């Protein structure tokens, strides 16, 4: 049964008891839940041990004359739905509990004006300061490992990511794709204000964005042409009054003029009134190639499959294992005790790692601080140290940032245990490659026999693999999990070639879509 807390003291006491040793996810909402919120909650429940749903209609983000008083509220319905989805806790504080003064006399978080004074912020002064203030309070109160936000509120998402970066907050921000009705209308609590006729009229927003997306896919990079394509569709529905239509950099929200950049994702954002209801929508125009994320337990054949998929598609194999080996080598080279985590963090935080892709069957080359260590990272001493280093939070944070940097341009295939859930949660194609414990043990036994080692017991191998699975799936940092949107491939009765071909066909199917 879902627990409901109205006070900070009650929630924090519960989290200290029930959340000890568990991953905590936060889904901040203003209530009146719809399918878009449902997608956030489902993903959070799938990925986190304990999920907190906050319901708070934030007065700080409503301006004079906006719909604060009539904003839809349905706490009983929200509670029932949250419980059915497996949410552990609802935090529904009062204005007083969150320290909001009627006179506005409270500490306020002020994100960069360049991000808050464009798009919606240009028409809703103070809105994003109100959002940032309450979200920061929620992060401080709940201390979540991951917070989930919808991509529909793209400006809010970009500002919160910047807030987390600038304030050195430890929470990970995870975005989830916009959920739409069959008509294409983006899910919103305000959709219930619309009459049936207005709801039909509102579908023009997404159709207009799709028109620009089509031009973009055809190679048009001129801002004026893309805006014209959108406006032509909007003009066919004169009852919809556009407040703004703009192309901005997706991360910084800076307006773009002239020609779109090829490197960075671009946000096409729109706000319009349908009757008296204000709606927003957006699409990201991204020139990068897709990313394939392959996860799975040890012994499932991920490394071999991933490399062959990359070769077969002409993509880059992102050897994340080589990155961890590189840092393990650096720690050994500098004489740092592996168990001295502060010293490890100090050393590795400033390390420069560069991968040097090589054609199969050569292993990936690596430079550390400009030094080629491609052979040095393959020694037994480094191999023995890798798992110890990989379990440290500072090391994982360092390499997570580096891996995502490689992913900025796309066109990569990466494998691991948390690639689709942690490193590239928005990868276009996610694969969970697995096999039974018995099958993986048989494969391992064949490897040992091929090396001339005949004194290996199959039953012991099975026990070792099962134990490794348990450790990987229950570790505190980035546990092995199947992403909710991953395609599972069980390889017990498949050859490597068959698995590779299956993944390549899935990739081609995605590209056609």
From Swiss-Prot:
Amino-acid positions noted as binding ATP in the UniProt annotation, renumbered to this chain: 30-37, 150-153, 179, 187-190
Q: Name one GO cellular component term.
A: cytosol
Active site location:
37
Q: Where in the cell is it found?
A: Cytoplasm
User: Which Cys pairs does UniProt list as disulfide-bonded?
Assistant: none
Q: Name one GO molecular function term.
A: ATP binding
Which pathway is recorded for this entry? Cofactor biosynthesis; (R)-pantothenate biosynthesis; (R)-pantothenate from (R)-pantoate and beta-alanine: step 1/1
Main localisation: cytoplasm
Record-linked Pfam families: Cytidylate_kin, Pantoate_ligase
Biological-process GO terms, alphabetical: nucleobase-containing small molecule interconversion; pantothenate biosynthetic process; pyrimidine nucleotide metabolic process
| Segments for region (Pantoate--beta-alanine ligase) | 1-283
Catalyzed reaction equations: (R)-pantoate + beta-alanine + ATP = (R)-pantothenate + AMP + diphosphate + H(+); CMP + ATP = CDP + ADP; dCMP + ATP = dCDP + ADP
Annotated stretches, region: Cytidylate kinase: 284-513
User: In which residues is (R)-pantoate bound?
Assistant: 61, 156
Name the SUPFAM superfamilies for this protein.
Answer: Nucleotidylyl transferase, P-loop containing nucleoside triphosphate hydrolases
Q: Which UniProt keywords apply?
A: ATP-binding, Cytoplasm, Kinase, Ligase, Multifunctional enzyme, Nucleotide-binding, Pantothenate biosynthesis, Transferase
Query: What does the entry list as the binding residues for beta-alanine?
Result: 61
Gene3D superfamilies from the entry?
HUPs (3.40.50.620), P-loop containing nucleotide triphosphate hydrolases (3.40.50.300), Pantoate-beta-alanine ligase, C-terminal domain (3.30.1300.10)
Give the family, as the similarity comment puts it.
In the N-terminal section; belongs to the pantothenate synthetase family.
Summary of the function given for this chain in its UniProt record = Catalyzes the condensation of pantoate with beta-alanine in an ATP-dependent reaction via a pantoyl-adenylate intermediate.
Q: NCBIfam families attached here? A: cmk, panC, PRK13477.1
Q: Which HAMAP family match?
A: Cytidyl_kinase_type1 (MF_00238), PanC (MF_00158), PanCY (MF_01349)
Report the protein name in the record. Answer: Bifunctional pantoate ligase/cytidylate kinase
- Organism of origin is Synechocystis sp. (strain ATCC 27184 / PCC 6803 / Kazusa)
């Amino acid at each position: 049964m879902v627990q409901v807390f109205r006070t900070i003291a009650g929630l924090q006491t519960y989290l200290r008891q029930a959340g000890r040793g568990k991953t905590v996810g936060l889904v901040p909402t203003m209530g009146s839940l719809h399918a878009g919120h449902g997608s956030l909650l489902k993903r959070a429940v799938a990925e986190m041990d304990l999920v907190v749903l906050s319901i708070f209609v934030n007065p700080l983000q409503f301006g004079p004359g906006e719909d604060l008083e009539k904003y839809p509220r349905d706490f009983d319905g929200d509670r029932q739905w949250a419980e059915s989805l497996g949410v552990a806790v609802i935090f529904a504080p009062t204005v007083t509990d969150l320290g909001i003064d009627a006179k506005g006399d409270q500490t306020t978080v002020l994100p960069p004006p360049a991000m808050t004074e464009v798009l919606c912020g240009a028409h809703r002064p103070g809105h994003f300061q109100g959002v940032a203030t309450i979200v920061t309070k929620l992060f401080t109160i709940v201390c979540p490992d991951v917070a989930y936000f919808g991509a529909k509120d793209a400006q809010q998402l970009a500002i919160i990511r910047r807030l987390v970066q600038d304030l050195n907050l430890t929470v990970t921000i995870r975005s989830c794709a916009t959920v739409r009705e069959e008509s294409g209308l983006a899910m919103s609590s305000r959709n219930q204000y619309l009459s049936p006729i207005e709801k039909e009229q509102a579908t023009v927003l997404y159709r207009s964005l799709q028109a620009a997306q089509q031009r973009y896919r055809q190679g048009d990079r001129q801002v004026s042409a893309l805006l014209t394509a959108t406006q032509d569709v909007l003009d066919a529905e004169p009852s919809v009054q556009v407040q703004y239509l703009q192309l901005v950099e997706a991360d910084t929200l800076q307006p773009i003029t002239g020609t779109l950049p090829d490197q960075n994702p671009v946000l096409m954002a729109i706000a319009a009134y349908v009757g008296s209801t204000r709606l927003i929508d957006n699409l990201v125009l991204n020139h990068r190639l897709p990313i394939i994320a392959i996860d799975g337990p040890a012994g499932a054949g991920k490394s071999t499959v991933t490399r062959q998929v990359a070769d077969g598609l002409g993509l880059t194999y992102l050897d994340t294992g080589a990155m961890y080996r590189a840092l393990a080598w650096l720690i050994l080279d500098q004489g740092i005790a592996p168990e001295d985590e502060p010293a490890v963090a100090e050393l590795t935080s400033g390390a420069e790692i560069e991968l040097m892709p090589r054609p199969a069957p050569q292993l990936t080359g690596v430079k550390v601080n400009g030094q080629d260590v491609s052979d040095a990272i393959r020694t037994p001493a480094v191999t023995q140290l890798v798992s110890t280093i990989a379990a440290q939070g500072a090391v994982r944070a360092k390499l997570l940032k580096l891996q995502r940097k490689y992913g900025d341009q796309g066109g990569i295939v990466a494998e691991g245990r948390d690639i689709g859930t942690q490193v590239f949660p928005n990868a276009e194609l996610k694969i969970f490659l697995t096999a039974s414990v018995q099958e993986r043990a048989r494969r391992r036994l064949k490897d040992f026999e091929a090396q001339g080692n005949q004194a290996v017991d199959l039953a012991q191998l099975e026990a070792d693999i099962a134990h490794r699975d348990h450790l990987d799936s229950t570790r505190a940092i980035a546990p092995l999990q199947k992403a909710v949107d991953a395609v599972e491939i069980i390889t017990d009765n498949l050859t490597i070639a068959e698995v590779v071909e299956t993944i390549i066909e899935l990739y081609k199917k995605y590209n056609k879509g």
